[in-house]
Amino acid sequence: MNEINQRLESLREVMRREHLSAFIFPSTDAHQSEYVADHWQGRTWISGFNGSAGTAVVTMKSAALWTDSRYFLAAEEQLKGTEFQLMKLKIEGTPTISEWLAQELQGENAEVGLDGMVNSYHETMGLIADLRKSGGITVRTNFDPLGLIWTDRPAIPANPVEIQPMEFAGETVASKISRIRTALRQRHADGMLISALDDIAWTLNLRGTDVHCVPVFVSYLLISSQQVSLYVDSAKINDEVKAYLTENGISLYPYNKVAEGLERYSEYNILLDGDETSYFLWKTVKCQEIIAGKSPIPAMKAQKNDREIAGFRQAMLRDGVAMVKFLRWLKPAVEAGGQTEISIDRKLTSLRAEQHLFRDISFDTIAGYQLHGAIVHYEATPETDVALKPEGLILIDSGAQYQDGTTDITRTIALGPVTEEMKHVYTLVLKGHIQLELAKFPDGASGTQLDALARECMWREGYNYLHGTGHGVGAYLSVHEGPHQIRMEWKPTPLRAGMTVTDEPGLYLSGKFGVRIENTLLIKDYQTTEFGKFLQMESLTLCPIDLTPVDFSMLQPEEIEWLDTYHRDVFEKLSPYLEGEDLEWLREATRLVDRVMSSGR
């Protein structure tokens, strides 16, 4: 019996003792985070699947894991040899968790368990309603079996908190809290609980290292009309940060006392976001009225101020320098032999680490060679790592956390000769990428309304990709930031000037190769006419796009013009920071398209 199946047996012993028919493990923590500290990696521990999104469900006789298209291939590999059955979200015929449980527990007097501290209020209430409809299955929300069976479970992290200087933050804590309180008054709320860690870090101009690749710290923030209370482990707070918080009128309380703080909130109306607040904490509130609604903070955080935008530009310059040095090194190193997916990841990270204000990578690098490139969120391990050859395509999706900005970039590189199919698919992705960057659109249009621009050239040939086309990017915060997105599914959040968003269409041919090209963009003003205000997008990312696999006959004149303009901008901005072979490589990589075509590459 392998380790995962042994853990399932231990879990079932506890379930039997607690009279539970099933237990649900989400991917989230007590703050509904996408990326979580090791302490809350319960779904990974019980299933072996380490993707950032997914839900594991275990009954006394079976086990299943639901995840989205980014992780289908990775999940298939990681679940091999375990009892877990892969459930592919948004694929026809895939049951919901409630439907599957209703079928699996049919005829039982069943009770399903979950930990109400790590499941959101909205998801839990939806599950309770669905299971009730599906045959009277009840849900127990106050039990965490991991506390009994995960004997070497990591502690909740207690790493030091740091102040994010005004030169990078661009807005004082007092100003942010004032804006939040104004938004609360407009909703007739006296206060709100903030659970989302990046929202807390942004509001207080603080950063931490509690979560891998995301500069946040585990805490809660309770804002009322008269007081601001930070619930955090005191071990994180040094004298400098404590004085800073006192200066800004922030009271400190122990992290594990947040429920008591909410219980005292009985005389006021409180705003709670059911997607970000845990079921347990929501049920703790005893105030006159809970005002259910979206937190105002993500929309504020999404529109970057002038200093944040300036920080992004500087971070992208340094990141571009690191990327050019890496790409100049890559092909000769592969030709010399001895390079693998893991070794080039280490090389790229080392080049970024040389840059000023580098703090960390912004997510685990995706370096997928050939067929591994078709795994959307592939992560090389010692077991899957492969040697690189001077042929075919490698997809490299990577990013960094600099103190003045967060980067996210994908380049697909031809390491040598490529097939005609590779050229065709690569060029389709490039066309989609360019068409989105060329967009001009009304202020307030949604990302869903723009999404088809990146896909239309692919749809005409029967291709598609199932992940989103773009997401927001934090200012030295999470590389995935909302509330805006560019995706097929309806997402009505308006796009506004000052928002950052990625442009990352891709195509993935299972068992063959994958292609993705990604820049981080800034939404900014375009023009105002009698029909209103219009916006456009500017690429913040500065790195050549590989022209070797391009079929130029597929490109329209405006697409060629965009490539030339972009590469001219990349050269002008990066060349002052490069010399020798790196500078010559950049000059060659940013040649005008007609020169590339006339030279036969």
Regions found by a protein language model. Give the residues of each.
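Active-site neighborhoods and metal-handling regions in enzymes and metal-associated proteins
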Residues: 1-601
